Amino acid sequence: MNVITNFSPLLKDKELIDDLPIVIRVKKFDESAAKEFSEKMSLAHNTGQPVVPVIIDSYGGQVYSLMSMISDIMHARIAVATIVQGKAMSCGALLFSFGKEGMRYMDPDATIMIHDVSSMAIGKVEEIKADAEETERLNQKVYKMMAKNCGHHEDYFLDIIHEKSHADWFLEADDCLKHNLANHL
């Protein structure tokens, strides 16, 4: 994740640079990316910009880091526009759905992939059972949130994933429009 910082060499005045719009790029979902996302969201609030563009091009990552980013978006005082370039897979697809209604953009050649939350549980039987319960709780939570964001009943995406035998579900841009994930191509 990075903020666009390659300004014109004609901009010498630091105050002008501080007021430029912040654009957030999300390429991965881990603790450092979540921290950087939070910092950039805070900076965006101080620019006076009416919208924070969040550009997603990611294979996914850690769900807890995604939850931190979602929290930042939900507590934002300005609108968040999400934009998919290339791919938004797993956590990337979920984050995409948190763009403000009417502000979810997708490149016509981009792909989204949705699947069950996964776990790398190892350990004693009871630890694995506890991890499986937490994985199921997270799975239910994030896909119900996604369904709400897209104007569907809460089990909409969970039902489709179940119908697809819990396999990875790849969607092209046109399919994302049909499911109200994307608002614009």
Where are these regions (language model features)?
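STAS-typified acidic loop motif
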Residues: N2-E39
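Catalytic phosphate/metal-binding cores of nucleic-acid and nucleotide-processing enzymes, i.e., regions
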Residues: F7-E15, L43, D72, I78, ...
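Second-shell loop/turn segments in exported
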Residues: V23-K28, I55-Y59, E126-A132
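Terminal peptide-recognition signature
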Residues: F37, V54, F96, I112, ...
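A structural preference for short, pocket-lining loop segments at secondary-structure junctions
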Residues: F37-S58
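Short, surface-exposed connector motifs at secondary-structure boundaries
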Residues: Q49-V52, M74-V80, E154-F157
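Glycine-rich beta-to-alpha active-site loop
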Residues: Y59-G61, S68-M69, I73-S119, S165, ...
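Charged, glycine-interspersed solvent-exposed loop segments at helix/strand-loop junctions
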Residues: A121-L185
